Each structure stands twice: as structure tokens, then as C-alpha cells.
Amino acid sequence: MPKLKTKSGAKKRFKITATGKVKHAQRGKRHGMIKRTKKQIRQLRGTRVLFKTDGDNIKKYFLPNA
């Protein structure tokens, strides 16, 4: 049976850390920023780490060769 292909959309959205955790960009910064406070916008910067079970599912189904 051939190897599973990595989903290209997931490849762009998620990164695997050296310890095996899955990082992703914070959501909610594409549009509609006018109604958010400066504090809310500032807190949306950077990346977050997924919960272990969610990260395991991402690695299993979308990033099988990572």
C-alpha cells in the first residue's frame, strides 16, 4: 500500500515542534478587526499549541509523514 499524502492545506497551517506538539496560528485576524479592542488584537499575535488529542488527530490524518 502506498504512503499517505500530506494534505497541502494542513501543511500550510500547522507546524510540528521538536517535541511532537502541533503549533498553529491564532484565528480571528482576517477581517472584522474594527470592532476589536487594541488589547484583543495584540493578544491574537503569535502561535498557539493544540491540545494533545487534537494534535494527535492532525498528525494522524493530515500530516502522516511529518
Curated annotation (Swiss-Prot):
GO terms for molecular function: structural constituent of ribosome. InterPro entries: Ribosomal_bL35, Ribosomal_bL35-like, Ribosomal_bL35_CS, Ribosomal_bL35_sf. The keyword Hydrolase does not apply. It holds the Pfam family Ribosomal_L35p. One of its GO terms (biological process) is translation. Belongs to the bacterial ribosomal protein bL35 family. SUPFAM superfamilies: L35p-like (SSF143034). Keywords: Ribonucleoprotein, Ribosomal protein. This is Large ribosomal subunit protein bL35. GO terms for cellular component: cytosolic large ribosomal subunit. Residues 20-40 are annotated as: Disordered. It comes from Nitrobacter winogradskyi (strain ATCC 25391 / DSM 10237 / CIP 104748 / NCIMB 11846 / Nb-255).
